[in-house]
Amino acid sequence: MVLLSILRILFLCELVLFMEHRAQMAEGGQSSIALLAEAPTLPLIEELLEESPGEQPRKPRLLGHSLRYMLELYRRSADSHGHPRENRTIGATMVRLVKPLTNVARPHRGTWHIQILGFPLRPNRGLYQLVRATVVYRHHLQLTRFNLSCHVEPWVQKNPTNHFPSSEGDSSKPSLMSNAWKEMDITQLVQQRFWNNKGHRILRLRFMCQQQKDSGGLELWHGTSSLDIAFLLLYFNDTHKSIRKAKFLPRGMEEFMERESLLRRTRQADGISAEVTASSSKHSGPENNQCSLHPFQISFRQLGWDHWIIAPPFYTPNYCKGTCLRVLRDGLNSPNHAIIQNLINQLVDQSVPRPSCVPYKYVPISVLMIEANGSILYKEYEGMIAESCTCR
């Protein structure tokens, strides 16, 4: 929790410094490159603090099967910049890979070898909807002297069974990795038996392998990690997204705006045109000073997060900068409030500032990260990359 506290303190300090620098710029009329470097990081810090690990987790030293799987899933779902692909078939906004906690070998019976794998499930707080649950496992194991054919099934301690069904009749399908791996859907099992429980739960699966040749006993499992033979995938959709408000005005306000718009065109056209011309002449060209989108890129290494964020290596939030003139052009898509604020500034009280240049449209970013407990998480964060700007 120390790292999480430090991140929160850094976020607050950065926010205070950003506001102080902004105030100084407004008074002195000077630009600051350092300010531009700080400002785009604020949204990402706020979003990722929720997923930040407590104790310094590290990236896996070896490129294991679980990490390979998630990297392939990420490659198919997002491009190298972290932008979600339009044709992605993942069907969810978040995928968590859960590694097994236990690796208990059961006495073998004949040619059968059994392991009980336990997968921890977090409490269901209603923030995310479980879309799908699958287990990815190796259905062919090639050891030093043995070839094994394997499959998985639910394990119930009170009702053990002596029946070892063949893997030919299961509902598994090929996984994203090699042909030695399969993926089996267990959504119904997880939803019915585990998902409605509020506390911590353990999903136990029985990993069963049949020898293809006569061999010794359990020594064939030595050196085989449980994470190398199976892992759990949980697919979620976010259920607490903000509700978009309808864009309309009361009828009286619409009439007021139409009347004021007509007055502006007839009574103040000359004054406004002169002001726009003077403003354009004062600065080095309206194209360079009017509200517009500016590219900006920062690496997660610069933020000190590269030890737990796997992909993408860079974040391109972009930012909006420029002057919002008294005549708001149509391309800015300014809201009705900005038009009213402009009217107040012109006709009522000039102490009310004109609208500011801010992002208008955003696109999400897909992030692949390692959680504190060692799970690997793919998650799409909405509203992370500015795509266009507006005055409001």
Curated annotation (Swiss-Prot):
Q: Which GO terms describe its biological process?
A: female gamete generation
Disulfide pairs here are: C291-C357, C320-C389, C324-C391
List all annotated glycosylation positions.
N87, N147, N237, T277, N373
Q: State any GO CC term.
A: extracellular space
Effect on the protein upon substituting R138H: In POF4; leads to marked reduction of mature protein production; does not generate a complete recovery of wild-type activity in granulosa cell line transfected with defective mutant and with equal amount of wild-type protein
Q: Which GO terms describe its molecular function?
A: cytokine activity; growth factor activity
Subcellular localization is given as:
Secreted
Reading the lineage from the top rank, the first entry is Eukaryota
Q: Does the keyword Glycoprotein feature in the UniProt annotation?
A: yes
Keyword Glycoprotein in the entry? The reply is yes
Chief location bin: secreted
As stated in the Swiss-Prot or TrEMBL entry, residues carrying the post-translational modification Pyrrolidone carboxylic acid are Q268
Looking up SMART domains in the UniProt record yields: TGFB (SM00204)
More info: The mature protein migrates in two distinct mature proteins, P16 (16KDa) and P17 (17KDa).
Q: How does it assemble?
A: Homodimer. But, in contrast to other members of this family, cannot be disulfide-linked.
Task of the protein: May be involved in follicular development. Oocyte-specific growth/differentiation factor that stimulates folliculogenesis and granulosa cell (GC) growth.
**Per the similarity annotation, which family is this?**
Belongs to the TGF-beta family.
Disease field reads: Ovarian dysgenesis 2: A disorder characterized by lack of spontaneous pubertal development, primary amenorrhea, uterine hypoplasia, and hypergonadotropic hypogonadism as a result of streak gonads.
The protein depicted here goes by the name: Bone morphogenetic protein 15
